[in-house]
């Protein structure tokens, strides 16, 4: 499967709005069933001990896996997370978080994904979390989207 240029442009723009824009998420690459994103860590992202907050790590994993799924469904469908499980391996203390999301089992209505989150500091890259998701593909008409403000 190939993503046409209009769909690719839409997905790359759509991935950064609202909360993800506030967090500073940047899409790096998108191909069918795979999405890579990055966040430059700032003071607002850290918890009390100076590491990237676990909620931030979970958010980038969920969002990136969601858009990996979104790349495989028709334009008249949306992706919603049904459930996910995340394992944290070590604190994220780098300059960036980078997430690689991929669809492991596509389906018409249900998709299964994985996401790996890395902490990047200089040339060093360490795996800090891995998540598994179950995603639902639903008709866009069933999902009300607020305007982007």
Residue ranges, per PLM feature:
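Terminal targeting signals and extreme-terminal segments of soluble enzymes
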Residues: 1-149
């Amino acid at each position: 499967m190939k993503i046409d240029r209009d769909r690719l442009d839409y997905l790359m723009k759509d991935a950064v709005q609202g909360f993800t824009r506030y967090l500073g998420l940047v899409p790096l690459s998108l191909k069918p069933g795979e999405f890579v994103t990055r966040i430059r860590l700032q003071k607002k992202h850290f918890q009390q001990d100076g590491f990237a907050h676990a909620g931030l790590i979970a958010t980038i994993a969920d969002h990136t896996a969601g858009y990996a799924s979104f790349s495989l469904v028709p334009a008249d469908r949306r992706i919603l997370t049904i459930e996910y499980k995340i394992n944290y391996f070590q604190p994220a203390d780098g300059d960036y978080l980078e997430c690689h999301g991929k669809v492991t089992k596509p389906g018409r209505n249900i998709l299964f994904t994985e996401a790996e989150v890395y902490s990047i500091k200089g040339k060093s890259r360490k795996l800090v979390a891995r998540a598994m998701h179950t995603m639902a593909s639903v008709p866009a008409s069933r999902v009300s989207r607020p305007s982007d403000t």
